[in-house]
């Protein structure tokens, strides 16, 4: 009973601590709208790197990774997170460019280069996807809480998770989000680093575990090179055009910090890929000694750590995983509300220029309203996998080239951005329908959409360069505009 009660106490204390952090940050650190939306653009290397990592590490990359290792993937499950680590390396090329824009959102940059239609279309796609992602993360958070406390109905757990997310995000904004990311990722990584050797030792060491495993479970490329490469491209595409990742680079104190944070995040995620994989394999080897272990190993990581590791370690890991899942939800929620106010309000006809106080108030109001809708969607029992697959694809397949290549190709024309957004989005939808959400013609839907977006971007540019069409305006501000923007963002501090 101790193993069940102690984690519960730690989880409750942890959630209360999150709310306290949000309240303190709201009172002490939030002085203007940029503090709330992009943490005042003053975050250091570790804050940015840990926040980038935490946004990709929740239940799916911890308990889900252990489940894959327990199942058919075996040791090759490590690629599920290691692929994300590898994808962060080319992202380091774009990171300083993202920070250099001095923007708040992706639609803002797309609009600077390719006009209002491109900005509005990108914002609508992003907001639609972020609604789905917020709903799925609330559902996942409620599911983790329900797994820890089965006596509480799932719907109650969903509502509880949603309320905590609303309060925390609404109070603390991006600063509180990054503080929690640092703590949560650190606790998960350290907790698993402590628990894994303990579990392996109880199992008789790695030699004993490997001897108890079928040969295919020890094949590092069991899932196949096509899947491994596909995952790397999939992560890169969703990271480069992902609002929650881009917003982290925008919070960096300078361009060098943004680039180095990408490299450090790659190292952190690579380390994180190892421990859940080993725990999943250990659970499979010890499955006859683990009462309560699900047939498919969905609870493999928590069961094996709960059985062998100290209760304090299990409790901290449980709390951090729940809160990391919630952190993904509040990141999506904050990005969504920021786009509604920063991009759609002005882009769709908002006449009144909002003051800093009005911007913060309206963004917080959007947080509450959007989260309530997301909670209702999560209560409808829509498939989390289906929501995530649709959301990740629809938000980045179209804008991928317009945003990413818009930063890197100075001579890009306006039409190249517009056409690439439309073509990439249509290609994703077609691939999603024809392939049934899976791989078709060796390509995942999101990768296919990004590929079509990129090809159409360059084809239009080559045609218009030959015709002498003028380049679109720059994605970057002039020196005078940068000076003015810094002054505006410093006002009120």
Give names to the regions the model predicted.
Residues 1-493:
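Membrane-embedded helix-loop-helix hairpins and adjacent transmembrane boundary segments
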């Amino acid at each position: 009973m101790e193993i069940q009660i102690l984690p519960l106490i730690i989880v409750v204390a942890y959630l209360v601590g999150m709310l306290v952090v949000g309240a303190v940050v709201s009172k002490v650190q939030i002085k203007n709208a940029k503090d709330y939306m992009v943490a005042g653009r003053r975050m250091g290397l570790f804050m940015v790197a840990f926040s980038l990592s935490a946004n990709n590490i929740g239940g799916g990359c911890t308990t889900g990774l252990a489940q894959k290792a327990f199942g058919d993937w075996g040791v090759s499950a490590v690629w599920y997170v290691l692929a994300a680590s590898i994808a962060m390396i080319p992202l380091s090329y774009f990171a300083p460019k993202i920070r250099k824009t001095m923007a708040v959102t992706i639609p803002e940059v797309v609009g600077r280069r390719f006009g209002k239609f491109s900005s509005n279309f990108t914002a609508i796609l992003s907001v639609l996807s972020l609604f789905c992602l917020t709903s799925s993360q609330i559902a996942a958070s409620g599911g983790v809480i329900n797994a820890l406390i089965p006596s509480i109905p799932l719907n109650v757990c969903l509502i509880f998770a949603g309320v905590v997310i609303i309060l925390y995000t609404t109070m603390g904004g991006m600063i509180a989000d990054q503080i929690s990311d640092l703590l949560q990722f650190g606790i998960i990584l350290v907790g698993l680093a402590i628990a894994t050797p303990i579990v392996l030792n109880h199992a008789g060491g790695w030699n004993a575990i490997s001897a108890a495993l079928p040969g295919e479970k020890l094949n590092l490329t069991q899932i196949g090179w096509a899947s491994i490469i596909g995952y790397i491209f999939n992560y890169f595409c969703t990271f480069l055009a992902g609002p929650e990742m881009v917003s982290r680079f925008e919070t960096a104190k300078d361009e060098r910090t943004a680039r180095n944070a990408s490299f450090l995040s790659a190292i952190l995620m690579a380390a994180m890929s190892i421990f859940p994989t080993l725990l999943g394999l250990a659970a499979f080897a010890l499955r006859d000694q683990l009462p309560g272990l699900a047939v498919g190993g969905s609870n493999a990581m928590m069961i094996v750590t709960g059985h062998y590791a100290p209760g304090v370690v299990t409790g901290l890991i449980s709390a951090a995983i729940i809160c990391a899942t919630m952190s993904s939800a509040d990141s999506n929620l904050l990005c969504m509300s920021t786009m509604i106010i920063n991009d759609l309000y002005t882009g769709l006809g908002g006449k009144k220029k909002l003051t800093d106080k009005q911007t913060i108030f309206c963004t917080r109001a959007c947080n509450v309203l959007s989260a309530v809708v997301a909670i209702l969607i999560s209560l409808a029992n829509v498939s989390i996998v289906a929501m995530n697959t649709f959301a990740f694809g629809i938000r980045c397949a179209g804008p991928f080239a317009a945003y990413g290549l818009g930063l890197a190709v100075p001579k890009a024309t306006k039409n190249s951005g517009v056409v690439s957004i439309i073509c990439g989005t249509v290609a994703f939808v077609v691939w999603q329908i024809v392939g049934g959400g899976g791989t078709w013609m060796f390509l995942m839907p999101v990768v296919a959409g990004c590929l079509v977006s990129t090809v159409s971007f360059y084809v239009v540019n080559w045609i218009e360069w030959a015709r002498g069409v003028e380049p679109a305006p720059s994605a970057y501000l002039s020196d005078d505009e940068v000076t003015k923007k810094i002054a505006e963002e410093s006002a009120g501090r």
